[in-house]
Structure formats: C-alpha cells, structure tokens
Amino acid sequence: PGAARRVVSVCGGSAARATHPTAPNLAEDVVAFQGEPGAFSELALKRYFQNETMQSVPCESFRCVFESVLAGQTRFGIIPIENSLAGSIHENYDLLLQYPDINIIGEKKIRIIHNLIGFSDVAISDLKAVYSHPQGLAQCAKFLDGFPDIQRVPFYDTAGSVAHIAKEKKTD
C-alpha cells in the first residue's frame, strides 16, 4: 500500500557517557528501539550495526528509548526522524530538545514497505478497521482513502498491531 524512506537516527549519550568504563549499568552492546520485535526501527538497527553484535531491546515509546540511554540500560537508541511520505517525526525532534545529553551519532536510511495484514479468509471489503502506528497510517493514507468505511485505529507500533490482531483474532 505505501512505500517510504525514513531517516532513522542512532542516538547515544554524550561521547563521555557512552564510552566511560565506570558508568553505572552501562550496557555496551545493547540498543533500544521503539516497538515490538520486527518493527521498522529494529530493521534499521540491524542494518546500522550489521558488522557488530548488538542486542536489541524493544521499548513502548520513543521517550522510553531516550530514558534507557540516559539511565545506562542501553548504550544506544534508534529512533525515526523523518520519512518521505508523512514528513518529520515531530515527537522525536521535541525529545532531542528535551534530552540535551542525547546526541545523534549516525543515521540509516531504510525503505519502508507497508503491508495490509489480516487473516487469509477475510476479504478487504469486510474490514471495518486498520490498526497501525500513526506514522504508518499517515504513510498509507492515499491507499486507505480508497476505503472510506475502514476506520483507522492508531496503535503504538506497526509490528505490535499485527501481534494484537493475531492475539485478539480480529477478523474485521
């Protein structure tokens, strides 16, 4: 339904904090990302750190990613900054301002391809709702506009919405 490119910035604490050998609870090989395993941010994480062994840690929110880095629970965090269809992720720009000890240390561009996922025996004409992260819904707006009766339900994560549909056995 929609394809987009978004810049995913890899965020870490200040250089001194990120590399200080006595920083409390500093997890050297751990990276936080927002969403469930399989989220686009985790894909960006794996591509950015493709030559390193890093453990990925899912977070419920972008703020949680920032806080895990500041607390030393993770060495890095990865967040989306912008995409070509829905524009800037303003929440993350705001968080960068709120957390001045967090610095952008790199970026990775990835292609996002969204899929409409449901049970195989359900026709698209029978759908009443589509669940996705607000950015995913925005990126697929043109496609979804072709189905005005389908409600768009914001969910905390695109991968998490798939897990929710499967767990709840939602067929509409």
Range-by-range predicted roles:
Residues 1-172:
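Domain-level signature for soluble enzymes in the chorismate/prephenate branch of the shikimate pathway
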